[in-house]
Amino acid sequence: MPSCTASTMPGMICKNPDLEFDSLQPCFYPDEDDFYFGGPDSTPPGEDIWKKFELLPTPPLSPSRAFPEHSPEPSNWATEMLLPEADLWGNPAEEDAFGLGGLGGLTPNPVILQDCMWSGFSAREKLERAVNEKLQHGHGPPGVSSACSAPGVGASSPGGRALGGSSSASHTGATLPTDLSHPAAECVDPAVVFPFPVNKRESASVPAAPTSAPATSAAVTSVSVPATAPVAAPARAGGRPASSGEAKALSTSGEDTLSDSDDEDDEEEDEEEEIDVVTVEKRRSSSNNKAVTTFTITVRPKTSALGLGRAQPGELILKRCVPIHQQHNYAAPSPYVESEDAPPQKKIKSEASPRPLKSVVPAKAKSLSPRNSDSEDSERRRNHNILERQRRNDLRSSFLTLRDHVPELVKNEKAAKVVILKKATEYVHALQANEHQLLLEKEKLQARQQQLLKKIEHARTC
């Protein structure tokens, strides 16, 4: 973590008020004694110490590069954060002391300067603002770009992996001091820490006119912010243009190195990348109890207005599938699977009903909501209850009428239905027998009538 109290000289407190940024103060010190007895200006920790920090606390710093302890200039946050060129601060002795002049030619993969678990964006913005102010105040000539490592642009969350941001670090030719030949061996190779392949685009050799090399930056577990596309450094006074090897994109596991330029703000805005969310689709899976959300992100770097040749914008599309488990009771049906069948109907019990039962209404289509299906079921059940009650009332009234027509059961109000049916059957048979006898008697009477009529006719003729 960059701060005034670097690991090279932990006992020294930065006294420059311009360099004292609250968000850049260290969260953890390498040694507790240095924290409490660092110097006369060091203040003991108070209750409001965590109010100064906008970022989350990080693990202790990784060991810095092997700087000589007795350097002419004390280390500060700017020298720890920047990779100065020969003419950035105008102090070649400081460049030789820190051995950063020819760092671009040490190894094909640059060194890892920051921790892998740093995350945050406000420190990068303040750092860029501070560097721009320093460059505008005359510390360096305009037009010279410096590679600034932003500790949070492409950093992944703790436990996540970062694809590694890429940027261009333009180094002008400078010789490497002899006493700094050993830091390259102590630096960590990014291929060891981050074994995944990273696509690097080598830019061709550019002429004296400055051009822009677009860079893409994205993270797997977190969407990265737009990274400033670097501008290649102009040719030196000797006439040698910046080589393509020096303008290679840096690839680290925990950081994105940015190139900070003191050009106009509109030029920097033209060189920023645009991250467009192309599609955010959310589909439901009917086979399991989880929903899958897919985010498709397209990163399109803008081409610089300064370049003579127009570079082709590279697009990096990331898809992030996040299984969302919103159901904890796995015995219950899934909320994402729409039920195609209505709830089972209760069996209808009939008591000696001669009427055939109605067929069960088929299940509703799955387009109907459960609330509508429940309301229809309750209405159907209510109608069924009404019809069943009416049927029972009609049956009871029929039994009462039948009981009233049976002479033996007229005064028996507590007669059972079986008794009513038996007595009514006997009474019907008795009535039928009586009817038959009456019919026979009627026939006899009619025959007697015919005989009497014949006698009357015979009497008149005589």
From Swiss-Prot:
Efficient DNA binding requires dimerization with another bHLH protein. Binds DNA as a heterodimer with MAX. Interacts with KDM5A, KDM5B and HUWE1. Interacts with MYCNOS. Interacts with AURKA; interaction is phospho-independent and triggers AURKA activation; AURKA competes with FBXW7 for binding to unphosphorylated MYCN but not for binding to unphosphorylated MYCN. Interacts with FBXW7; FBXW7 competes with AURKA for binding to unphosphorylated MYCN but not for binding to phosphorylated MYCN. Residues 257-276 have a biased composition (Acidic residues). It is found in: Nucleus. The modification Phosphoserine is found at S259, S261. Residues 143-176, 232-244 have a biased composition (Low complexity). PANTHER family: MYC PROTO-ONCOGENE (PTHR45851). This is N-myc proto-oncogene protein. Residues 19-47 are annotated as: Interaction with AURKA. A motif (9aaTAD) lies at residues 76-85. Positively regulates the transcription of MYCNOS in neuroblastoma cells. The 9aaTAD motif is a transactivation domain present in a large number of yeast and animal transcription factors. Its main location: nucleus. One of its GO terms (cellular component) is nucleolus. It comes from the Eukaryota. Pfam families: HLH, Myc_N. Keywords: DNA-binding, Nucleus, Phosphoprotein, Proto-oncogene. One of its GO terms (biological process) is positive regulation of epithelial cell proliferation. Residues 61-90 are annotated as: Interaction with AURKA and FBXW7. Residues 379-431 form the bHLH domain. Residues 134-177, 232-289, 332-390 are annotated as: Disordered. InterPro entries: bHLH_dom (IPR011598), HLH_DNA-bd_sf (IPR036638), Myc_transcription_factors (IPR050433), Tscrpt_reg_Myc (IPR002418), Tscrpt_reg_Myc_N (IPR012682). Residues 431-452 are annotated as: Leucine-zipper. Changing T58M: Results in decreased phosphorylation and subsequent protein accumulation.
